[in-house]
Amino acid sequence: VWKTFFMKDGVWLALAFMLLYRLPEALSVKMLTPFLLDPPEAGGLGLSTAQSGLVYGTAGVIALTIGGILGGVYAARKGLRKSMWIMALSLALPCAVYLFLALVQPERMWIVYACVVLDQFGYGFGFTAYMLYMMKFAEGEFVTSHYAICTAFMALSMMIPGLFAGWM
């Protein structure tokens, strides 16, 4: 199974894609909780754990789900190849909302909610393309095993950058 996976056409390009596609999210997600909870004088937003849970764990999850569903609809209509750039940008660019939040330090919670919802919606929308790409790449004789290998690289793509996120 391993041999057939690494003999697939374009395997090294596919692995580079799998390892780099989620890089912005991999770097930002590890620092998100400290950013939300740290006091403003330390560069954070000073949210309580309840506020953080509500904004990220509730509003964010709802936006992520809606983004994923709409990403699937979009990719089904346009095709994965035609939609890849839009979906990749929708995953990467919303991470900039945290730069905005860090610079502005808003006191109004609705601004924080709107930014987190935008980020999570974009992540859900863009992540759909990533999943579809792995499904497409895994096609062939050992589709289930090859997809499992792809998901292992997906996990690795979040773990390795996460190790360095706090130093940046």
Predicted regions and their residues:
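C-terminal transmembrane helical hairpin of 12-TM major facilitator-type secondary transporters
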Residues: 82-130
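Transmembrane alpha-helical cores of Major Facilitator Superfamily
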Residues: 19, 54-62, 89, 117, ...
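Helix-to-loop junctions at the C-terminal end of transmembrane segments
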Residues: 66-85
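Residue-level signature of mid-helix packing/kink "hotspots" within the transmembrane helices
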Residues: 61-69, 158-159
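Loop-to-transmembrane helix entry/capping segments in MFS-fold secondary transporters
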Residues: 49-50, 140-150
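Juxtamembrane intracellular "pre-TM" segments in multi-pass secondary transporters
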Residues: 1-13
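Short amphipathic helix-loop junctions that connect adjacent transmembrane helices
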Residues: 21, 30-52
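Small-residue (Gly/Pro/Ala) motifs that create kinks and tight helix-helix packing interfaces
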Residues: 33, 71, 161-166
